[in-house]
Structures are given as C-alpha cells and as structure tokens.
UniProtKB/Swiss-Prot annotation:
Induction of its expression: Induced by potassium chromate (K(2)Cr(2)O(7)) and cadmium chloride (CdCl(2)). Induction by Cr and Cd requires sigF. Probably part of the CCNA_03001 to CCNA_02999 operon.
Coiled-coil ranges per UniProt: none
Pfam families with a match to the protein in the record: MbnB_TglH_ChrH
Record keywords: Stress response
The protein's name: UPF0276 protein CCNA_03000
Disruption phenotype: Not essential even when cells grown in the presence of its inducers dichromate or cadmium.
Source organism per UniProt: Caulobacter vibrioides (strain NA1000 / CB15N)
UniProt keyword annotation of Lipid metabolism present: no
Family: Belongs to the UPF0276 family.
Length: 280
C-alpha cells in the first residue's frame, strides 16, 4: 500500500487546547497529530474528543510505545488496539519511533536507541513487517534523538533508516530537531545527514525545541523552535518539497495563539527553503 503525500502545516493536539480546536468556527491548522496511546481506550472523553476533531481535521496518529527495536517483538495486543483506533479515525497515517522502550516486561517509559547493526536491522524490520501486517497499512518511523552511540555500530543512522525503508516499505517521519540534537551530541554534520535521507520516503516533518544539558542537548519539546533548527528545516524544505510539517510542544505549553504564530514562521521558512532550492 502506498501512502499519499499531504502538503500542509499542523500542530500536536494537546489537552490545554482541546476546547479551542473544538470550538473554533474555522479550521485553525491543516491537520493535527495526536498521541495514539492517549486515545487507545474503551470509551469516555478521549474518544469523544478524537471523534469530534476527526470531523474537522485530517488526523495523524503518532505513537510512543510500539517498540520496533525490541528483541521481545511488538506486542500483538498493542497492535490490535492501535488498529481499532486507526479503523475508527481513518488517519492520514500511523507513526512511531525507531527505538525500543523495554524488555521482558520492563517498561522504561523512554525512547531508547537501537544499535545500527545488521542484527538490530533484522529485529527492527521483522517488527515493522508484523506491525504493518496487523495494521494493514504502512508505518512511518521517526528518527530518534540520541545521547549515546554503540561501539559496534556498523553504519550511520541515515544509512540504517534508508535500508529499513528499502526492506520493509515503511516511510519516514523526519524530526528536524532530533537530527540537530544528535548531530550536536555526536559531532556529525546535520546537513550531510539530510542529503542522505531518501527523498521518496519522507512524508512528515517534526519541528520542536530543545534544552542545553550539562554536556548534551536534550530533546525536551519545552521551547520554541530555535534558529538552528529553522535553518536546518529550510534545507529540508529545499530537498523534500511539499510534505506535512508540524510543531511539537509537550511541556511548558504556551497559549494556542503563540503556537499558531510559530506555525506561520514554519510556512515562511518552508517558502524560503523552496525558493533557495529553485534558485540553486
């Protein structure tokens, strides 16, 4: 199954802004992204909200618990509940992260990195294949933010992503802030990374802010998008063209008007990136 590109700008739907999205007389954004697990429930307010939002906006489902990097495999119960939500919402697409979250019943509640080895590739691809079979749709996988590397890494992250897509037919959700954070933490060139990502597999872009830790940049989603990430986004716009782009804010969430103004910056930066690409 082939997914169709969506050219638009959106926001992550968060509880402080539910009412504004539901009460607005006109659409506020081109699409919304929701955290899948927040709506994988049997009833109640979450399903009322997602049903109402779905009537007004295209919706992307974005998960944090699939754990495609786990040697334990992806849990079938989780996939079946996710499929139930996807069948209800009819989303633009379903995405999660290239990571693992736990092992042998332990849940770290974090997005842990996978080693970039052939052994890990086999695990990841088998888990993606199972997920796509159960969900009956292709997945988008997001590049992680990274704070450690593995001594036995056999390839760069962008090489791993490209091979993963080639083997499974999955797509990419390219997080520009994560690229910048990982590049800063590990000393690689984020623009060379962008240049190596397969153009035809990128369907969505995330934009977010980060914080400076004692030694590393941390992907905190509690700050506005910084100039360094905007500059990288312009380069991405020039390379990948019209793909869905959205801003994530998960902590210190500002008023919705502030995020809508930031989304206007995203539109302007995208246009600047496209102009630069056409002039080159």
């Amino acid at each position: 199954m082939t997914l169709q590109p969506f050219d638009g700008f959106g926001l992550g739907l968060r509880p402080p802004h539910y009412r504004a999205f539901l009460d607005s007389e006109r659409p506020l954004v081109d699409f919304v992204e929701v955290i899948s697990e927040n709506f994988m429930v049997g009833g109640g307010r979450p399903l009322h909200v997602i049903d109402a939002v779905r009537e007004r906006y295209p919706v992307a489902l974005h998960g944090v618990s699939m754990s495609v990097g786990s040697a334990d495999g992806v849990k079938l119960d989780y996939l079946r509940r996710l499929k139930g939500l996807a069948d209800r919402v009819d989303p633009m697409w379903v995405s999660d992260h290239l990571c693992w979250t736990g092992v042998e019943g332990f849940n770290s509640h974090d997005l842990l990195p996978v080693p970039y080895t052939e052994e890990a590739m086999a695990v990841v691809c088998a888990n993606i294949a199972l997920a796509q079979d159960v969900l009956e749709r292709p997945l988008l996988l997001e590049n992680p933010s990274s704070y450690v590397t593995f001594a036995n890494d056999a390839m760069a992250e962008h090489q791993f992503l490209a091979e993963m897509c080639a083997r499974t037919g999955c797509y990419l959700l390219l997080d520009i802030n994560n690229i910048y954070v990982s590049a800063s933490n590990h000393g690689f060139d984020p623009y060379e990374y962008l240049a190596a990502v397969p153009v035809d597999r990128v369907l969505q872009i995330h934009l977010a802010g980060h914080s400076q830790g004692r030694e590393l940049l941390i992907d905190t989603h509690d700050q506005p998008v910084p100039d360094s990430v905007w500059a990288l986004y312009e380069a991405a716009a020039g390379r990948f063209g019209p793909v869905a782009a959205m801003i994530e804010r998960d902590d210190d969430i500002p008023p919705l008007d502030d995020l809508l103004a930031e989304l206007d910056v995203a539109r302007a930066r995208w246009a600047a990136g496209r102009r630069g690409s056409l002039a080159a």
